[in-house]
Amino acid sequence: MIQIIKRYFTDRDERGKFEGLINFGNWREFNLVETNANVTRGNHYHKKTKEIFIILKGVVKVTAQNIVKNKLTGDTEEKILKKGDVILIEPYVNHTFYTLDKSKWINVLSQIIQKDSPDIHRIKENLI
């Protein structure tokens, strides 16, 4: 459910480091998210949209669970993310982020979220 994306290359020299983060997909929307400590974000799923999260700063607990017929199903998966971590969330995976520290990340989406008809769906049960 929470797919860790590994670097596809890393080069280091006297100038510093250069890392390849993402070399797949057709991504349509990029967002910068800054969140204070002890805040919950998300707790929703998408029917069509894939999302990548690139953690730039802080520590974030992400919880995920599959959705079937608008209900949480199966085991809950939880990961602690820190600076440099990159994850992929597929459609029909409810995902909730809880910031353990003041955090900043880039959110990359495969679809543009339309204000009049967003691909954001919520359920009544809480993951956190």
Describe each PLM feature range.
Residues 31-49:
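Conserved short histidine dyad/triad with adjacent acidic residue
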Residues 67-91:
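Short acidic-glycine-tyrosine-enriched beta hairpin
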Residues 44, 50-56, 79, 96-97:
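His/acidic/aromatic-lined binding-pocket segments of jelly-roll/cupin-type domains
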Residues 36-38, 83-84, 90-92, 102:
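Tight coil/turn sites that cap or link beta-strands
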Residues 48-68:
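Glycine- and acidic-residue-biased ligand/ion/polar-headgroup-sensing regions
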Residues 1-28, 42:
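A short, N-terminal "cap"/entry segment at the start of jelly-roll beta-barrel domains
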